[in-house]
């Protein structure tokens, strides 16, 4: 086929415009269908048509989960982590219209880890000498820029991590000059209020996700643990409590 031959989307069958093709491993995808994929998905070019169809079915099912989602806690300012603690689910999004954005709804049990990373960049400050040339300070002075990133590692068939920036704008810090010329001083970014606030938010998100994962794992382990046989106080039978904590013979409530 020629470069400018007509192409059709292998998902919806619609004609693809000149700049609208999104290549798949064995086919073509239009930009409208591509928009429906998960925002955390990044392996489109290596995906087959059938794999994309399966993901779009998953995304359509996700719309029902978004509709049923009841936010009980929100962490974040720009990109937010929304929790439905009653249902044991969460989502990450910066969208205001959740129905339109259709952010992936995940179970607490899907979380496998969570990291907070602080990206530091520095650039040297210079001054002009008597001849107008830019020269370094003695000792050299720098200004710093910080960005704060959360990475949530998850079990999901279409992506294994969700990485996003906490702060909408970089935190820029210019330390004061040294008290004595020629003597270097150490600067602690923790003395900057904005830096501290961003780090605190990141730690809160990380701790929350780490805790809910721990709670889920503990419940799974408890459910899998063998239950000890006890004597029912009502029928005197030796019984193992059922899922409701009742005697398997007479149905009496057991405290053991």
Q: Could you tell me what each predicted segment is?
A:
Residues 37-104:
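Anionic N-terminal interaction surfaces
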Residues 27-43, 250-256:
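Short Cys/His-rich micro-motifs in 6-15 aa windows
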């Amino acid at each position: 086929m020629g470069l400018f031959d007509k192409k059709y989307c292998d998902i919806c069958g619609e004609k693809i415009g000149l700049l609208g093709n999104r290549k798949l491993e064995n086919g073509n995808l239009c930009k409208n269908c591509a928009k429906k994929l998960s925002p955390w998905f990044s392996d489109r070019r290596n995906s087959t048509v059938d794999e994309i169809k399966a993901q779009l079915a998953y995304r359509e099912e996700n719309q029902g989960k978004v509709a049923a989602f009841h936010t009980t806690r929100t962490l974040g300012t720009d990109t937010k982590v929304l929790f439905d603690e009653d249902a044991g689910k969460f989502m990450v999004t910066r969208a205001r219209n959740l129905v339109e954005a259709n952010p992936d709804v995940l179970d607490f049990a899907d979380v496998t880890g969570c990291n907070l990373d602080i990206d530091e960049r520095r650039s040297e400050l210079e001054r002009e000498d008597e001849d107008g040339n830019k020269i370094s300070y003695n000792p050299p002075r720098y200004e710093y820029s910080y960005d704060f990133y959360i990475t949530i590692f998850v079990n999901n068939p279409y992506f294994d991590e969700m990485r996003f920036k906490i702060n909408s704008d970089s935190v820029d810090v210019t330390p004061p000059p040294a008290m004595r010329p020629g003597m270097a001083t150490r600067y602690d970014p923790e003395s900057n209020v904005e830096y501290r606030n961003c780090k605190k938010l990141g730690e809160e998100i990380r701790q929350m996700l780490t805790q809910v994962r721990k709670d889920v794992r503990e419940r799974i382990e408890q459910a899998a643990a063998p239950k000890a046989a006890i004597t029912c106080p009502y029928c005197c039978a030796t019984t193992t409590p059922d899922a409701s904590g009742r005697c398997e013979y007479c149905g009496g409530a057991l405290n053991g």
